C-alpha cells in the first residue's frame, strides 16, 4: 500500500531562563531623543505618543503618560511643566522632557501615590535592552531633595534596573562618588533607599552631568515607570519648594521573532520510493526563522519532534554529515553536534540510545542548537525515517 506520512509540526521551545544577553546591532537599535523634538508645553493629564527610529528608518511608537498627586504648582523656573524645553538641559545643551513642580509637602513614600509624579513609558510590545538617561537629580536645602524610583514591567513581573552615574556609582553597591550630586540605593541612614531609588545630596546646575543617571534593563519589558518626589525633611529643614528633573534619551532593541515550519519529502526521486511506499525513506526538514531585529540568546532554542507511528528513525550518517541529522546553519550562527541531540523511546524522557540503522523504538527527537541565533536569519535541521 502506498501512503503519505504527514509532517506533523515539531514543538519549539525558546527558553528565557536568564535575562536577555545577546544585544542587537546598532543598525537594529531604536533611538529617541527629546532634544530632537520641538519645544512644547505639555499637560500632566494627557498621554503623548512618540516614535523611536533605527538608522534604517524603522519606527516603533511608545507613549508617555503621567500620574500626579499633591502638586501645588506646576511652574518651575518660569516654565510650566511638563515641557520639552531648554530650561533644563543635558550636559551638551540638548532639550529634555522636564518634569516637576512644587509639592504641598514632602513625600513620605516614593512607592506610594501621595505627593508623587509617576511618568510611564509604554511600548505596547516587549522590548529588550531598554536604556533611559535622566538628569539633574540633586538637592537644595529647605527647597527640595529629589527622590526617584525606577521600575520596569512586562505586564506580569516587576524588574529592577541597573542605575549608574557618570562617576562610577551604581545601584549594586549604592553610595555617592565625588562630583556626583546624588546617592544611589541601596543605603541606610540617613537615606533609606532600595536599589530602585536615588536621592539628591548636592547641587547640580542645569547643563552639568553631576545629577545624571543612566538606567538600563536586562529583562524584556513592556513599560517603565519613573516615580519622582521630594525626600522627607532632614537636618533642620522646614520648607518645600519647586523642583524638576529631565529625561533626554531612550534606546531599546526589538525582541526576536521566532517562527518554525516542518515539511517532509521522499528521499528517493525515482522508483517507487518517491511515492512513500513501505520500506522507502522520508526526509523531514525543520526550518527555524528569526524575523526579529534582535538575536536569540545562546543555547535557548530547543526543538522536540515526535515521529509518526509508521516511521522508523534512521540512526546512521546523513550525508554529508556524520550524524543522523544535517544542519544547514545559513547565516544564523548556530551549531549542532551529536551531543546536542537526544532521543526518546516514550515521547517524554530523552535518555534513549538508538540502535544503529533503522530503529522503530525512537518515538521523538530533541535538538538543542548551540550559539547565538543572529537577527533576521534562519536554519534548517533534517533527519530521515523509513516508512514501515
Task: Give residue ranges: language-model regions.
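Exported/extracytosolic protein signature
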Residues: 255-388
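Extracellular beta-strand-rich recognition modules
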Residues: 130-134, 223-229, 379-381
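Terminal, low-complexity interaction segments
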Residues: 24, 30-34, 157-256
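Low-complexity, serine/threonine/proline/glycine-rich extracellular segments that form mucin-like
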Residues: 111, 116-117, 121-154, 159-163, ...
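Extracellular beta-rich ligand/substrate-recognition surface
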Residues: 98-115, 199-208, 372-373
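Short, flexible beta-strand-to-coil junctions
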Residues: 102-104, 135-141, 229-232
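N-terminal targeting leaders for non-cytosolic proteins
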Residues: 23-112, 151, 155-194
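Sec-dependent, cleavable N-terminal signal peptides
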Residues: 1-23
